[in-house]
Design a protein with these regions (language model features):
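His-enriched metal-coordination microenvironments in redox/metal-binding proteins
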Residues: 128-410
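Structural signature of tandem alpha-helical TPR/SEL1-like repeats
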Residues: 425-432, 457-470, 477-480, 490-504, ...
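Structural marker of alpha-solenoid helical repeat scaffolds
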Residues: 440, 474, 508, 542, ...
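Aromatic- and Gly/Pro-enriched helix-to-coil junctions and flexible linker segments
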Residues: 17-165, 173, 243-249, 254-256
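Conserved alpha-helical positions within TPR/SEL1-like repeat arrays
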Residues: 446-457, 480-491, 514-525, 548-555, ...
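Terminal, low-structured helical/coil segments at or just beyond the last alpha-helical repeat
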Residues: 562-569, 577-580, 584-587, 599-600, ...
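Canonical positions in the second alpha-helix
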Residues: 437, 470-471, 504-505, 538-539, ...
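Glycine-centered coil turns and helix-coil junctions that link the paired helices
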Residues: 170, 553, 557-564, 636-637
């Protein structure tokens, strides 16, 4: 009986433990911290979300919806595989946290003790990064129509900057987060984007971002709901010069009524110039051509790194038909590293994935990407019903498939090597893309101009001539159109025709400094040194801070075939101005200075200038030419340019 009594007692104890209740979660202690940390960036006053989650009443009102969207992992939006990274701001809920929210709702959405609430966040006038040093706003609001498909509008915002600044951070405020879904931001140091904006009746313009508008010195600039890039380290700032415009491509979705959109941008400055410059690598194909109904169309691309790099950030980009993206690195020893995988791509949730700590990849690593598209009626995001053929293009109704990578190299020579080699790869792909765009829009002069510049970049000047001729015919004979055609003709070796085009540009616009400068170059190649010098002097007179004009004039005064045309002391003065303008970081400028010093008999200084130029690792054939000239300086001999007349 004693044994039975003990067994019964143990049974009672065991039964008691089995009935212990797990505490019911409360809002103040368990749910409010989760909401603030994972949802607060969007579900805040003026945030991108359609409603706020700032109070117990807010969260209780949407409690059932929160359970649903967290359980299916639709919210908070984080499309990348959780095993990727770790990335800055990586904030998917864990399974335990999702279950905690469910238990709170099942338990009656208990509020709890107010003393358990986390301290509220306080933004400075809505700026997450603190008070900006400069705030710019679209001068006039844009009116988004009530109905219709998504709208992509390009806004140009001039920057009131009177001196060179260095930027540590940029924060974008959409102005109307209910309808602005994401934005890509670039900088344009020319007036080209502004001219398109001015030509349009309303704020901004429709179409494509020009090639003159680009990301600054290897930095991503953009905005998606809930994402604010942290301030950059002081050694990674980017340069902002006067007369620069911000070019904002905004993706907007009609709400059912007319909406006013007036975005603002806050800039954060530093007095410290960068000591390191990132590179932007873009994997992708511009030959995309997806048949209607195709469910498994695949696009791949890869690149072998010529130098060691540290990967700072990734950004996949595609449109509505894309369903999956994968980025991978294969190390020289064959080891594979998954960079990013998004199994359910959604164009509406683009994101820059910035590593918490840079990912090191050694020289010889192959970086690759793979996109999968579904152009069938089964794809709920397909913008065409019924599906139609989809080709590469920058409009949202077209398709794209890129994986951008921001990387840092170990030193400046490695950066030069990487950017030079990778740019050659990208330019060939860009030619394909622009030819596709021109097929669809044959009368777009901007497309013809951009395609022509790409043909020049890949060493196919006759292709450039054809596109510039078409642009000239469309523009009706403007000075820039004649100038562009003259440039392509000169590269193609058609010098007499080039001279004619440059002279027509100058006749239309006598103050066209670049036309005078390029005309001088062609005349010099024809052996007409005196005429060339006159054109170079006109170019410098019209644009005294033009490094190109100063360098060309200094070069001919230092190296002219005939001694009577050489003026060494003036050449030295001009070359020193060029070197100062380029902060001693331009190998060609230093080469000109070396030639000028040698012409003046200062051979030690000439050798030093050549050595400094070579340390910048210039591309061939410039590097070989500098070495040959340096050998002359060691022998106490100046460099004298060959006389074109002697080669005829």
């Amino acid at each position: 009986m004693k044994v039975a009594t003990v067994a019964l007692a143990l049974g009672i104890v065991a039964s008691g433990f089995s009935r212990t209740q797990v505490p019911i979660p409360t809002y103040t202690k368990d749910i409010a911290p989760l909401i603030a940390d994972r949802c607060g960036m969007c579900h805040d006053v003026g945030g991108a979300a359609p409603f706020g989650l700032l109070t117990y009443a807010d969260v209780k009102r949407h409690a059932t919806q929160i359970v649903t969207v967290t359980r299916n992992r639709y919210m908070p939006p984080w499309k990348a595989d959780p095993s990727n990274g770790p990335f800055v701001g990586q904030h998917p809920l864990t399974s335990a946290e999702i279950d905690l929210i469910r238990r709170w709702v099942d338990g009656g959405t208990v509020e709890g003790d107010p003393r358990d609430l986390p301290a509220p966040r306080h933004w400075t006038d809505g700026w997450r990064l603190g008070p900006p040093d400069l705030i710019v706003t679209l001068p006039q609001p844009y009116t988004l129509q009530a109905e219709g498909t998504d709208v992509f509008r390009i806004f140009v915002i001039p920057l009131p900057v009177s001196r060179t600044r260095f930027v540590r951070g940029l924060e974008f405020r959409p102005g109307n987060p209910k309808v602005v879904h994401h934005a890509n931001i670039r900088v344009d140091t020319t007036a080209a984007s502004r001219a398109l904006d001015d030509a349009d009746q309303g704020p901004g313009y429709n179409g494509l971002i020009l090639r003159s508008a680009d990301y600054p010195e290897g930095h991503f600039l953009g905005w998606t709901p809930g994402q604010v890039a942290p301030l950059l380290p002081k050694d990674l700032t980017w340069r902002l010069d006067p007369k620069t415009d911000l070019v904002v491509e905004a993706h907007m979705q009609p709400s059912g009524k007319k909406e006013s959109v007036q975005p603002s941008i806050g800039l954060y400055f530093s007095d410290t110039p960068p000591t390191r410059t990132p590179a932007m690598l873009r994997l992708g194909r511009q030959t995309i051509d997806i048949p209607a109904g195709e469910k498994q169309y695949t696009v791949t691309d890869s690149y072998v790194l010529p130098v060691d790099v540290e990967v700072e950030a990734l950004q996949p980009h595609a449109h509505y038909r894309a369903r999956e993206v994968q980025g991978e690195a294969t190390l020289p020893d064959g080891t594979k590293r998954l960079l990013i995988h998004i199994a359910d791509w959604d164009f509406r949730w683009q994101h820059v994935f910035q590593y918490e700590s840079p990912l090191r990849l050694p020289k010889g690593t192959t970086v690759s990407m793979r996109w999968v598209y579904d152009n069938s009626a089964d794809n709920p995001r397909n913008p065409q019903r019924p599906p139609v053929r989809a080709q590469w293009g920058q409009r949202s109704s077209d398709e794209m498939g890129d994986l951008w990578m921001q990387v840092l190299t170990r030193n400046e020579p490695d950066l030069v090597t990487l950017t030079r080699q990778f740019r050659a790869k990208v330019a060939v792909e860009d030619v394909n893309g622009y030819e596709l765009e021109i097929e669809k829009h044959p009368d777009d002069t901007g497309l013809h101009d951009s395609a022509a510049l790409l043909y020049l970049e890949v060493g196919r000047p006759e292709g450039a001539v054809a596109h510039f001729q078409k642009a000239l015919a469309l523009k009706g004979g403007s000075a820039p159109a004649h100038y562009n055609l003259g440039t392509a003709l000169s590269v193609a070796g058609r010098l007499d025709e080039a001279v004619s085009e440059y002279r027509q540009a100058i006749q239309i616009d006598g103050g066209y400094a670049n036309a005078h400068n390029n005309l001088g170059g062609v005349l010099l190649a024809q052996g007409k040194t005196g005429e060339a010098v006159r054109e170079f002097r006109d170019a410098v007179r019209l644009q005294p801070q033009s490094a190109s004009g100063l360098a060309n004039l200094a070069w001919v005064l230092a190296t002219a075939p005939q001694a009577a045309d050489r003026h060494a002391n003036e050449a030295v003065d001009l070359a020193m101005r060029v070197v100062d303008l380029t902060a001693r970081r331009d190998a060609r400028a230093l080469d000109v200075l070396g030639a000028a010093y040698a012409s003046a008999g200062q051979f030690d200084r000439a050798q030093e200038a050549a050595s400094t130029a070579l340390r910048l690792a210039p591309a061939e054939p410039l590097a070989a030419e500098i070495r040959r000239r340096q050998d002359l300086y060691r022998q106490g001999r100046p460099y004298v340019a060959p006389d074109p007349a002697s080669r005829r």
